[in-house]
Amino acid sequence: MVKYFVFLSLVFLMPYCNAQQVIPLYQGKVPNSKSVTNEEQRVANSDVDSLTSNVSVPTLSVYLPPKGLANGTAVIICPGGGYHVLLTKREGSDAARAFAKMGVTAFVLKYRLPNDKTMLDKSIGPLQDAQQAIKIVRHRAKEWSIDPKKIGILG
């Protein structure tokens, strides 16, 4: 009976165990950043979304389409939040999973939000992260079976 329960538990949990690769945008020091403690916060809010703020270490999360469905296109998703927070669930991972189901390789960019405390020039920080994300996806396009000329950005 215990084996049966464990088996069923694993079967039902498998769809939720789709661990994604998370890639740091920069190796070493993040450009245009001040040396401060990482104070990133993530708050789950069932009424709104999962809210991420105070990002100082930007990352790129990879959502691959199912085998045989990939169509060679990619999208980098920049979750919204009015440059105050990132809505990382609804406008990030949920959107990425929907794109992946359509055969599009999706990436969620956790980017730095304008902040005088963490950036030397807050007017260019988010743009630097978006540009770096595009460079990474183009550079590793072959690894993910992406046509480097078919990479879009959303957000």
Question: Predicted regions span which residues?
Answer:
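Short beta-to-alpha linker loops that shape the active-site pocket of alpha/beta-hydrolase fold enzymes
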Residues: 81, 110-114
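N-terminal cap/lid segment of alpha/beta-hydrolase-fold proteins
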Residues: 20-69
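Gly/Ser-rich "nucleophile elbow"/oxyanion-hole loop immediately N-terminal to the catalytic nucleophile
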Residues: 125, 136-153
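Active-site glycine-rich loops that stabilize anionic/oxyanionic intermediates
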Residues: 29, 79-84
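Short amphipathic alpha-helix adjacent to the substrate-entry channel of hydrolases
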Residues: 88-108
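Short beta-strand element of the alpha/beta-hydrolase
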Residues: 71-80
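Serine-hydrolase catalytic-loop signature spanning alpha/beta hydrolases and amidase-signature enzymes
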Residues: 82-84, 106, 136
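Bacterial Sec-dependent N-terminal signal peptides
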Residues: 1-21
